[in-house]
């Protein structure tokens, strides 16, 4: 079968609960991908994009804070820097309050050359209170 028109995609998820302290990167234990623009290793939290283009990034999950009431928040980072607008925040009133953080954004990965490597490494970072995340899901789709 000719896959010339097949999009590069990644669907990464973690169904089981994972404890995430403040500033921890969320990890995804399972994945399914197509194409060759996106690289990911199960059990990690880093997605590497090696081909230039526009990419749609979406995250969702279920979270419960783990002891201290406050804001449960996650932030998409590209090469260690926050991606503006790619943040989800919800207030958890107590240790049993369930929140559903989610965000969606589009990023651009510029063309690389011999002297400039524009590879993008994406992570989802817990920037709120320590929390337990379950059913975390990250999708990356190369639009063009």
PLM region spans:
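Extracellular jelly-roll beta-sandwich "head" domains, especially the C-terminal globular C1q domain
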Residues: 1-144
């Amino acid at each position: 079968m000719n896959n010339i028109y097949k999009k590069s995609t990644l669907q990464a998820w973690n169904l089981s609960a994972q404890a995430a302290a403040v500033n921890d990167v969320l990890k995804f234990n399972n994945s399914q991908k197509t194409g060759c623009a996106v690289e990911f290793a199960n059990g990690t939290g880093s997605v590497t994009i090696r081909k230039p283009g526009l990419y749609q990034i979406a995250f969702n999950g279920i979270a419960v804070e783990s002891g201290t009431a406050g804001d449960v928040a996650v932030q998409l980072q590209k090469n260690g820097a926050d991606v503006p607008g790619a943040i989800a925040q919800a207030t958890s009133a107590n240790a049993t309050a369930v929140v559903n953080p989610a965000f969606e954004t589009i990023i651009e990965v510029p063309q690389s050359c011999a002297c400039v490597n524009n590879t993008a490494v994406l992570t989802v970072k817990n920037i709120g209170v320590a929390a337990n995340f379950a059913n975390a899901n990250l999708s990356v789709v190369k639009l063009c």
